[in-house]
Amino acid sequence: MNYRGIYRRRYVFVLLLLVAVVNISYGWTVLKNKDYKRRYLSPSGVEKVRKHLSRKYVASRNNTQTFKKHYFSNTWAVHIDPPDNDVADRIAKKHGFTNIGKIGNIEGHYHFKHEEIGERELEKARHKTALLNLEDEVKFAEQQKILERVKRDGIPNDPYFKDMWYLLNTGQASGPAGVDMNVVPVWKKNITGRGIVISVLDDGLDWTHPDLEANYDQTASIVLNDNDNDPMPRDSDADNCHGTRCAGEAAAIANNGICGTGVAYNAKIGGVRMLDGQATDALEASALGFRGDHIDIYINCWGPKDDGKTFGKPGPMAAKALRLGAEQGRNRLGSIFVWATGNGGLTDDDCNCDGYTTSIFTISIGCIGDHGLSAYYTEKCSSTLAVTFNGASHKEGRENKMVTTDLYHQCTEEFKGTSASAPLAAGIIALTLEANPLLTWRDVQALIVHTAQITSPVDEGWKRNGAGFHFNHKFGFGRLDANAMVNAAQSWKNLPAQRKCTAASGFDHQDIPRGDSLFINIPTVACESSSAQIAKVEHVVLTVSFVHRRRGDVSIDLISPKDTKSQMLSPRKYDDSDEGLDEWSFMTVYNWGENPKGIWRLKITDNPNQDDVMNLFNGDNTDDVESLEERVIDTQTKQNKAEWEKMRKENPYFDVPYPNGVRKNKVTIEGSTQDHVKPKEGAKEPWGNYRNTNNINNNSSTAFKRKKKQ
């Protein structure tokens, strides 16, 4: 289990249309003691009032009182019955208050203010409250507590949030500012994943982590390896951190001063421990089918080996569990299975060789770095639906931070791989489901297709299909955009029922010429004039069998009637198997929205010269556009750094901040406008001449270009 030529046989082609609070405000009301109700207070009466105020007040169960410093303002709420503004003015003036006016539209409630009572004058304030309550017309008088309120600007206060550039990119990483998952606008709408349940199918979940515990859902958790209900990982093995890290990215708690923030920080999170032992078809089926009536989203960051030579797929029971989850999960709306595409780019692996990511029932998620470029370990295939960020670079080198929860109640910034991307997608889907809980599993996929954003736009791999959707074998339909998905979901109309149409190839055995291609036409009327008729396709599944002396030499392309080309299988230089394939199902989503009626063309190629083929597909020793982008970025970074170093050497004050008491203004010296600083009036000037200390920020052409780009 991995954490995230051709001769005679038959070819079968299948087209599938999937289609188709009560906020209880705690405060104090000073209770009146009718024994104190006198026009004037005698000395004994004053003493009684003081004794009354010195003990803890008896209040209704919705009211409590703690007199603490800095908790009370110099304003009072006073209820006068019968309502009379003149009476309110008279009582206010009598006791040194000003009647500010009525409180909103509440009948008989007035707002009094006392200018001479400070927030620390507790005894004086208590006495004034008692005096007001002794007035016959006053039903109650209450000094107003200063309430702690914060702006709901959607920005969490967790200590590591500033490093989470993929959630809010202010330019803190090496990439341009503003390029992120666009989740903050969703949080500002108070959509935070509330009511959605996510479960991580992995090596366990440290649910006692303080950044996860309050969101933990025991009902969404189990241990399949040991028949236990506690998904705590075996923390004696530090490698068993994978599930805990995935969980934190999706649903870590916000605004608790701990670690970072999950995308859906109010969603519930559970864990299915199933990777801490031997994997079997029965175990995987049990995990994928666990509590489909309760769990909305399943995070899966595992699969077959990413070694460039393995073909692996779900067993019959696991495959059935995926199908039943889509048909019956979430009260028949369909469970959402999010799957990491894999990290086999360095071994020229192809995610279409992974039967989990090619299932029509899963959402296959790839990764990009902060510049929108593919990671050096990205796998390309036609089943990838979309991408999210992780910390990787396009070529092996610098890495950016990915913040999440870790074992031993720690926080890590070192989470990597597509395992760091899929949980972000799960969190965004949780936000989407909160916005519209009636979305089906196919609706969620369709929303991704409709709202994903182009990343790395200069990459020549971007194409448009016959329905107008942009796609790329590296990036799917693009980068997930949380705000766009949520906005679309709120007015989304459910897709009609799913239809399936099968088109046979109509031939038996054919040979492929060595070093050449075999072309096969597959006509279809898309089940016209039947209940299975399809007008707009969603998924296309191609089932192929072949034998070949070297399986890795084979590539397969499928061209739709709208001339959209999907690479179903790319050559793999490490795949030396002579076993071929037996009824392997490849899948493409890149015909989404097209009318499938017409002639589909299948191209199967024998590629005997692997060096040339690898250069063609991977860009080695060729003009790889992404590599060019990376080189430009690195060059700009080096130039900028060199310019800063030069300024630092030439100016001894370059790194010195402006001291307290300094004011800065612009002056013209020899025709050039420069910063000039001097003490504020009355301040001493112990530091001497303090000019031109920050010119690089204001005048550097490199800095200006970067700022403009952002």
Curated annotation (Swiss-Prot):
Gene3D superfamilies: Galactose-binding domain-like (2.60.120.260), Peptidase S8, pro-domain (3.30.70.850), Peptidase S8/S53 domain (3.40.50.200). One of its GO terms (cellular component) is Golgi membrane. Residues 164-486 form the Peptidase S8 domain. Residues 668-710 are annotated as: Disordered. Residues 495-638 form the P/Homo B domain. Residues 689-699 have a biased composition (Low complexity). CDD domains: Peptidases_S8_Protein_convertases_Kexins_Furin-like. InterPro entries: Galactose-bd-like_sf, Kexin/furin, P_dom, Peptidase_S8/S53_dom, Peptidase_S8/S53_dom_sf, Peptidase_S8_Asp-AS, Peptidase_S8_His-AS, Peptidase_S8_Ser-AS. Residues 1-29 form the signal peptide. Coiled coil: none annotated. Belongs to the peptidase S8 family. Furin subfamily. This is PC3-like endoprotease variant B.
